[in-house]
From Swiss-Prot:
The entry's keywords: ATP-binding, Chaperone, Nucleotide-binding
Source superkingdom: Bacteria
HAMAP family with a match to the protein in the record: HscA
GO biological process, one term: iron-sulfur cluster assembly
Family: Belongs to the heat shock protein 70 family.
PROSITE patterns: HSP70_1, HSP70_2
Name of the molecule in the record: Chaperone protein HscA homolog
One Pfam family linked to the record: HSP70
Keyword Nuclease annotated: no
Length: 617
């Protein structure tokens, strides 16, 4: 007799089968892959025993060369060797050329304005370059784990926007990987740190990588990792230390600038090696194109001090957002290879008033956290052991009448999240509504970032204010936003998934937060003025419509003249810049039209009761 295997839909017939999953730290300078084996998370090494894979791809031949071999070719083939491609993800060609004018690559724009790199092998975009790095990491994982991966968790900087996150997902798809989740890098570090130490309290995760800086303030409590606030800079990292030192060396050596692409790459490699040496030495002998000299750690630290101070400004802002004082932070976790720089450790320690934790390898901690999370999401470990709460870095809102912003999801709200709010029509007979989605902290639409627009059509004609349109904002676990608008009486709805064509420029996020505080008073005054103008428009339009409908029947010529004068006065005030004056004008107009409103009400009641008997009533 045959035995039938019965299982729940979607479940494995072997429920205890361990699924192969990996966490990938797709870094600006280096990338890593980690996994949980025998209950322990660790990075997976290549055949030479190396965890790090340089995030460098060479396209000089038919096959892409990735990692250390590509790095070795970077000086001789700079235009075909793509370095720090993570900085290019989600950016327009114009933005890249403005921000990184010294890049040696041959760029051209695609039809949608996104960058294409021209190489000997052919045209490549940043997504394709990232995919080639992911393929090598995936192959390493599959060889180490003995089979095909069921899924991966890929880390991204907390400040990556929708376009940059979507680009990361697209790269993984191109590499043939199933993405279980995108995970913020500081949060991944918190997972690795939290499981290792078991501590509870407020933790600061200071993540300074090759190309990005992130600061996260987290609360660890009974297995719950809650991100209280995030901050940082999407274009500040150890690469910038290298460039400053390279410029200093070029000046010391008396080199004529601009340098050729090949010389520039050689100089950067020398600068990087010198920077690394300063972690153990006070001075380094340097040879640059025939010039020999000694560079001291003190000279290097003076060059980079302003950049380190810039990271501490982000730390201060994040603490304020989290409503936490620096002395409340129990531990400071250092993440990213650039935190090996002694000045960084020293200044961070002074800022928080405690020695930063460096016992976990700062290069590997993010990948290890991602590996742990991948193990959970693959079903190898009950997720009840850990609850992860990420946050959105900037408020998401909608434009309302008068160019005002109504915030639907405030910044630092934990994700995934869905929030809904009801809106109505402004004019009689309105059959469509335009939904304008914005991002930012300011009160007026012009001061925020426009994300997308779409229209809801098919609203039944009704009096102004009678329709009920429910607008729902939903942010998934990867930080991607979808917006739905639905008219409640008919069920007609429209939806959009927000994917900006490219990401925020370098300091835009930080500037948006800074401006919201700098201009808080002016913004509230502008909002009050706009609100009064919208209300004045409503009163003016309503009164004009009422006079056109019933003025001849219910008003004398003198009363008409009085109301027209009130309307003209209110229009004049409405076009001014005094919110209080407009508010008073609205009150005066309401008072002047009170008798007219009563007569219209009486007329409506008489019309409704006409022909009815007392018994019916």
């Amino acid at each position: 007799m045959a035995l039938l295997q019965i299982a729940e839909p979607g479940q494995s017939s072997a429920p205890h089968e361990h699924k192969r999953a990996a966490g990938i730290d797709l870094g600006t300078t280096n990338s890593l892959v980690a996994s949980v084996r025998s209950g322990t998370a660790d990075t997976l090494k290549d055949a030479q025993g190396r965890s790090l894979l340089p995030s460098i791809v060479n396209y000089a031949n038919e096959e892409a060369i990735v990692g250390y071999e590509a790095k070795a070719l970077s000086e001789s083939q700079p235009q075909d060797t793509i370095i720090s491609v993570k900085r290019l993800l989600g950016r327009s060609l114009t933005d890249i050329q403005t921000r990184y004018p010294s890049l040696p690559y041959r760029f051209k724009a695609s039809e949608n304005g996104l960058p294409v790199l021209q190489t000997t092998q052919g045209d490549k975009n940043p997504i394709e370059v990232s995919a080639d790095i992911l393929k090598v990491l995936a192959k390493r994982a599959e060889e180490s784990l003995g089979g095909e991966l069921s899924g991966v968790v890929i880390t991204v900087p907390a400040y990556f926007d929708d376009a940059q996150r979507a680009g990361t997902k697209d790269a993984a798809k191109l590499a043939g990987l199933h993405v279980l989740r995108l995970l913020n890098e500081p949060t991944a570090a918190a997972i690795a740190y939290g499981l290792d130490s078991g501590q509870e309290g407020v933790i600061a995760v200071y993540d300074l990588g090759g190309g990005t800086f992130d600061i996260s303030i987290l609360r660890l409590s009974k297995g719950v990792f809650e991100v209280l606030a995030t901050g940082g800079d999407s274009a500040l990292g150890g690469d910038d230390f290298d460039h400053l030192l390279a410029d200093f060396l070029a000046e010391q050596a008396g080199l004529e600038t601009p340098l050729s692409a090949e010389k520039n790459r050689t100089l950067l490699n020398i600068a990087t090696a010198t920077k690394i040496a300063f972690s153990e030495q006070d001075s380094v002998e340097v040879e640059v194109f025939g010039w020999k000299g000694v560079v001291t750690r003190e000279q290097f630290e003076e060059l980079i001090r302003p950049l380190v101070k810039k990271t501490l400004m982000s730390c201060r802002r994040a603490l304020k957002d989290a409503d936490v004082e620096a002395d409340e932070v129990l531990e400071v976790v250092m993440v990213g290879g650039s935190t090996r720089t002694l000045l960084v450790r020293e200044m961070v320690g002074e800022f928080f008033g405690r020695t930063p934790l460096t016992n976990i390898n700062p290069d590997e901690v993010v990948a290890i956290g991602a590996g742990i999370q991948a193990d959970i999401l693959a079903g190898n470990k009950p997720d009840s052991e850990m609850l992860l709460l990420d946050v959105i870095p900037l408020s998401l809102g909608i434009e309302t009448m008068g160019g005002l912003v109504e915030k639907i999801i405030p910044r630092n709200t934990t994700i995934p999240v869905a929030r809904a709010q009801e809106f109505t029509t402004f004019k009689d007979g309105q059959t469509a509504m335009s939904v304008h989605i914005v991002q930012g902290e300011r009160e007026m639409v012009d001061d925020c970032r426009s994300l997308a627009r779409f229209s809801l059509k098919g609203i039944p004609p009704m009096a102004a204010g009678a329709a009920h349109i429910r607008v729902t904002y939903q942010v998934d676990a990867d930080g991607l936003l979808s917006v739905t608008a639905m008219e409640k009486s008919t069920g007609v709805q429209s939806e959009i998934q927000v994917k900006p064509s490219y990401g925020l420029s370098d300091d835009e996020v930080a500037n948006m937060l800074r401006d919201s505080m700098t201009y808080a008073k002016e913004d509230m005054q502008a909002r009050a003025l706009a609100e009064q103008r919208v209300e004045a428009d409503r009163v003016i339009e309503g009164l004009i419509a009422a006079m056109q409908a019933d003025g001849d029947e219910l008003l004398s010529e003198a009363e008409k003249a009085t109301l027209l004068q009130a309307i003209e006065s209110l229009i004049e005030l409405r076009n001014g810049n005094e919110a209080n004056a407009i508010e008073q004008g609205i009150k005066d107009t309401d008072k002047a039209s009170q008798d007219f409103a009563s007569r219209r009400m009486d007329k409506s009641i008489r019309a409704a009761l006409a022909g009815q008997s007392i018994d019916t009533i």
